[in-house]
Regions:
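Jelly-roll (double-stranded beta-helix
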Residues: 1-8, 30-32, 107-109, 135-136, ...
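N-terminal regulatory/effector-sensing and dimerization cores
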Residues: 2-3, 7-106
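Short, Lys/Arg-enriched, Trp-marked, Pro/Gly-tolerant hinge/linker segments that flank
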Residues: 104-118, 126-189, 202-214
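Basic/polar phosphate-binding segments, predominantly the helix-turn-helix DNA-binding elements
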Residues: 182-218, 234-260
Length: 261
């Protein structure tokens, strides 16, 4: 499937359910800190941006920069102030990636500055958006991932600390009740709301509320691809109304739900 507008295009194919791609041109899209259940690879084509989430903290990305973002890694990438930027973003199913490119299966983002690898990424992504067959596209994707593994002399670093045992009941509650209140979550951990916010942010990089919104957006992505109506989706995810869903989705995904669909 190919869907586009003036600045953004998405590519998906039921024959390749493990991959989704996006292109954005002359965009002003800004993102709140967020995470994906997928492994993501981004490329900056024009303009500059500021990336947060790598082991080196904040990094400035320029034309030709690549960034590898493991599943679950909290990050954000935004254009320089008052500037436009163009970029490409690839999302890969995490289990599929682990099976086919385990060398990329870390948990900390990495920034690469490699002209040859960037050129290969662009060629591979152009092929995804073309009318080539699924086998040819998948072969190009696998070849690019092998090149990524070679370019990363060492596997991606694994520096994410285990979530403290005290927060395990909070994560379990969020799994069972995605819209649980802060008071409910604090009670599950045996902490005050303030203590929970501080401990949860230290462990996950997000406040409990930001974590909930991020999870809602990730659920919305899959539900939108399945054709769920926006009004129904807003109700299912606990948003006040459709407009509330649209605002939150755009803040995390850089595009409205209707355009993502």
């Amino acid at each position: 499937m190919y869907a586009s507008n003036n600045t953004t295009a998405f590519w998906r194919d039921p024959a390749l359910p493990h991959v989704e791609s996006r292109r954005a041109c002359n965009s002003r899209a800004c993102y709140k800190p967020h995470s994906h259940p997928t492994f993501s690879i981004g490329a900056v084509d024009a303009g500059g941006s500021i990336f947060t989430g790598s082991q080196d903290g904040q990094a400035v990305l320029a034309n030709g920069s690549l960034v590898l973002v493991p599943a679950g890694c909290v990050h954000a990438c935004n254009p320089l102030p008052d500037a436009l930027w163009s970029y490409q973003m690839l999302h890969l199913d995490a289990q599929w990636l682990q099976a086919h490119a385990p060398g990329l299966d870390g948990d900390t983002a990495a920034v690469l500055h490699c002209p040859l690898l960037y050129a290969q990424f662009c060629a591979m992504n152009a092929l995804l958006f073309s009318r080539a067959g699924a086998e040819e596209k998948n072969a190009a994707l696998l070849a690019f991932l092998r090149a990524c593994v070679s370019a990363c002399a060492d596997p991606l670093p694994s520096e994410r600390k285990p979530v403290p045992q005290q927060l395990a009941p909070v994560l379990e509650t969020l799994q069972e009740q995605p819209s649980a209140s802060l008071r409910q979550l604090a009670q599950a951990a045996g902490l005050s709301p303030y203590q929970l916010i501080r401990a949860f942010r230290a462990a996950t990089g997000m406040t409990p509320h930001a974590y909930q919104l991020n999870a809602h957006v990730n659920r919305a992505r899959s539900r939108l691809q399945a054709g769920t109506a926006l009004a129904q989706l807003a109700h299912e995810l606990g948003f006040a109304d459709q407009s509330h869903l649209q605002r939150v989705f755009k803040a995390h995904a850089g595009i409205t739900p209707g355009r993502y669909r």
